[in-house]
Amino acid sequence: MATLIAADANAAATTALSEQDLRLLREAIRLSEASRARGRHPFAALVPDADGNIIASAGNNSMPPEGDPTQHAELAAAAEAARKLSAQALASATLYTSAEPCCMCAGAIYWCNIGRVVYALSEHRLLTLTGAHPENPTFSLPCREVFARGQHSVVVLGPALEDEAARAHAGFWQG
C-alpha cells in the first residue's frame, strides 16, 4: 500500500492509497498509453462511481486535428462526470489522472465539485520529461495551490506510481 501526503484547503494528513485507488490509477496510466498510441499527448483521466465502475474517462485531445488546447484529459473527464453524477455524488467522487492536473484542469475539477484527486506523475517530474516543448507549456503551480484558494476542500493524493506513468512519455517529447 502506498502512503502519500494528502493536502486540501484546510490541512495535510497522511493517507494510504487503497488497492482500488492503485487499480484505477493504473487504468488512467494505461489510458494515457492508449492516448499516445492514437497519436495524442500521453495523458488520461477517469472518474469512477461509488462502486468503482468507471463512468467517465478521457485521453488528451488538445492537439490536431481538433486543435483545441483546452481539451485536456482531466477537464474532459470532469465535465463528463458532471453530466452523469449528482452534485452529492461528485463531492464524494475521485478523479484519477496519469499526471498532476494543470491549473486549468484543477479549476475545472473544483468547479465540477469533485472532492478528491489521485495523480501519478507530478508537474515537476513532467517538466523534466517535456522540457520546453511548445505543445506542453507548463505553469509552476501545483494543483494543491489552486485547490487551497477555493471555498471548499479537494483532497489531493500524489504523486504515486510516477515511474509507471513516466513510461508513456519516454521519447514522446523529443524530436
Language model features with spans:
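Short beta->alpha transition motifs characteristic of CBS
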Residues: 55-62, 122
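Immediate flanking context of iron-sulfur cluster ligation sites
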Residues: 87-100
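A short, polar/charged loop-to-alpha-helix boundary motif
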Residues: 63-75, 80
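Zinc-dependent deaminase
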Residues: 1-35, 108-175
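Short beta-strand scaffold segments in enzyme catalytic cores
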Residues: 43-52
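Small-residue (primarily alanine) positions within well-ordered alpha-helices
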Residues: 28, 32-35, 45, 56, ...
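Conserved redox-active cysteine motifs that mediate thiol-disulfide chemistry
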Residues: 99, 103-106, 111
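A short, polar/acidic, helix/strand-boundary loop motif
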Residues: 18, 60-65
